[in-house]
């Protein structure tokens, strides 16, 4: 009967017979929510670390690929130039091919930038929540 009167007054007695201002069940739920929130925060930090490492790896790989593409294009262009120096028709064809390749690379660059922007927005949204 004493516990009921204390509860009416907004006071509660826990399992250790200590006087509390919050119902022990509510306090337990709050502690559980706090623990889950902390666990989620740790998981989010782990995700950020993992995605950051992945992004760095992808950027490094992209730089290597781009370097190799440029090197291959230089070798090909050198070979084509050596062959085409004597033939103006072949020179015009090479110019057209290089123009088309340049346009394709420009479009590819735009697509990659768009994907990068979307990924940055996604990561930003995840870090804000």
From Swiss-Prot:
The keyword RNA-binding does not apply. It is found in: Cell projection, Cilium. Residues 89-121 form a coiled coil. One of its GO terms (biological process) is intraciliary transport. Signal peptide: none annotated. Keywords: Cell projection, Cilium, Coiled coil. One of its GO terms (cellular component) is intraciliary transport particle. Component of the intraflagellar transport (IFT) complex B required for transport of proteins in the motile cilium. Required for ciliary entrance and transport of specific ciliary cargo proteins such as che-3 which are related to motility. PANTHER family: INTRAFLAGELLAR TRANSPORT PROTEIN 20 HOMOLOG (PTHR31978:SF1). This is Intraflagellar transport protein 20 homolog.
């Amino acid at each position: 009967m004493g516990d009921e009167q204390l509860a009416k007054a907004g006071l509660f007695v826990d399992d250790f017979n200590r006087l509390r201002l919050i119902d022990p069940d509510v306090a337990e739920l709050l502690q559980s929510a706090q623990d889950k929130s902390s666990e989620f925060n740790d998981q989010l930090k782990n995700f950020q670390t993992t995605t950051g490492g992945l992004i760095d790896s992808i950027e490094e790989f992209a730089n290597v690929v781009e370097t190799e593409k440029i090197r291959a294009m230089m070798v090909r262009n050198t070979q084509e130039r050596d062959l085409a120096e004597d033939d103006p028709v072949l020179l015009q064809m090479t110019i057209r091919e290089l123009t088309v390749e340049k346009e394709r690379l420009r479009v590819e660059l735009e697509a990659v930038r768009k994907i990068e922007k979307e990924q940055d927005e996604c990561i930003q949204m995840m870090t804000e929540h």
